[in-house]
């Protein structure tokens, strides 16, 4: 669920960009909170298929997707077959505005895709 992989040849030496690839998942939780991912991992340890047979659930910390090129690559590869992306933001939309814009486009590209954005703070 939390595996990070560099794509060979995908970044210039020294630019600090690490492209993220994860196995395809039916639903993906993108969150600012490591505790969300810990809870998700615990649930998956208890029930590896909580969405039913042939359906999977994955997660990633939003901090891994801060660079626009990394986010674009992640959407094109890891989210290509996903049906639901849940984004839990801590600190407001401004911290992930490009990401929200791109994920909105991802959701609008196919009718079976859904995007859910949850605020992790009271003011949002």
Task: Enumerate the language-model features and the residues they cover.
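An N-terminal assembly and electron-transfer interface module characteristic of large anaerobic redox
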Residues: 1-124
């Amino acid at each position: 669920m939390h595996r990070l992989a560099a794509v060979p040849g995908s970044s210039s030496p020294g630019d600090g960009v690490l492209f993220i690839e994860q196995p395809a998942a039916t639903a993906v939780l993108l969150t600012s909170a490591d505790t969300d991912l810990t809870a998700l991992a615990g649930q998956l340890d208890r029930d590896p298929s909580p969405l039913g047979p042939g359906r999977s659930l994955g997660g990633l910390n939003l901090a891994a997707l801060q660079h626009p090129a990394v986010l674009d690559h992640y959407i094109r590869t890891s989210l290509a077959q996903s049906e639901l992306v849940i984004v839990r933001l801590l600190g407001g939309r401004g911290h992930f505005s490009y990401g929200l814009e791109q994920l909105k486009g991802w959701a609008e590209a196919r009718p079976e895709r859904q995007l859910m954005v949850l605020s992790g703070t009271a003011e949002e």
